[in-house]
Amino acid sequence: GVIYGISAFGLANNLRIPRDEAKAFIDNYFEKFPGIRKYMDETIAFAKEHKYVQTLFGRKINTPEIGAKGPRAGFAQRAAINAPIQGSAADVIRRAMVRVPAALEDARLPARMLLQVHDELLFEVPEAAVDDTIAAMRTVMEGAAAPAVHLDVPLTVDAGQGANWAEAH
């Protein structure tokens, strides 16, 4: 919650701790990670000036409520901070999904993509092709940002397998 702009009051309620303890935690967090506070402040300022924010890929996300007053102001600011992060993650998974059919065909894999949930892809794969499919999909997903965006931190992919989605976790 801290990175999404939770208040000391909200954190205290969530953790059932005194408000002054929650405030100290938030203050300490931003002292240890000053770049996060800078990102938050710059993102809010940009959103207020332009009425949108952008993902890493340049996709614009409108922030029409950013000038709101009262309780809506905090919500609008948190939404503006979060939108580039979650929007960029959505862009990455979409780019991966577009590349999946060609990757499966190129590797002659009998797998079938069934579903996407947030940053997860679910496949139906014959047992004999599981390892090769995992390797191919790991390559697709870890390279999904390229060549449009160079990431300083590599994307990493966790993979699981099972007879159903619950077992795969």
Residue ranges of model-derived segments:
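Conserved catalytic core of nucleotide polymerization and phosphodiester-bond processing enzymes
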Residues: 1-169
